[in-house]
Amino acid sequence: QVERAALDSIRAIMIIRAYRIRGHLAADLDPLGMTDRGNHPELDPVSYGFTEADMDRPIFIDNVLGLTHASMRQIIDIVRRTYCGTFALQYMHISDPAQAAWLKERIEGYGKEIAFTREGRKAILNKLVEAEGYEKFLHVKYMGTKRFGLDGGEALIPAMEAIIKRGG
C-alpha cells in the first residue's frame, strides 16, 4: 500500500513535469478547428502506468498544483487547462529558479487560468495588426534598407503597451 502510494506520487509528478515541458504539443492553436491536436504519448497517463480505475484515486502531490492530494483526473484537468489551452505559457527553459517559480505560482492550479475578455482579445489583435501593417509599410517605403523587423516578436507589441500603461 505504501509502495503503491509512493509510486503514484512519483508518476503524478512525472506527468505534471511532462505537461510543463511538452504541453505545448497538445495546445489548442487552431482557431478554426481544422487540425486535430492529437495525443502525445508523453502526456498520456497510461504511459505512466495509470489505468482508468486509477483516475479517481487520491494521490499525494505535496502542494505541487496548489493541492496536497488530487486524483489523476484532477491533475490532468489542471495541467491541460494550464499548458494546452488557447493561451499557454512555457517557462521550463528559464534557468533562474526564482523566475520560473514566480511564473509557476501564478499559472498552475484551479482558478489561475489566463482568460481575456472579448474586448481584450480585440485590442491585442488590433495592436498586432497595426504592428504588422507598419512593418509592411516600412518594407515598401525603405526597400533594400537594412532594418530589424518583428518576425516572431509581434506578441511583444501588446505586452509592451500593457507594461507602459501599468508603469506610467
Where are the regions a protein language model picked out?
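Extended, charge-enriched "interface" segments that sit outside catalytic cores
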Residues: Q1-L156, I164
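Glycine-rich phosphate/diphosphate-binding loops that line cofactor/substrate pockets in enzymes
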Residues: M160-G168
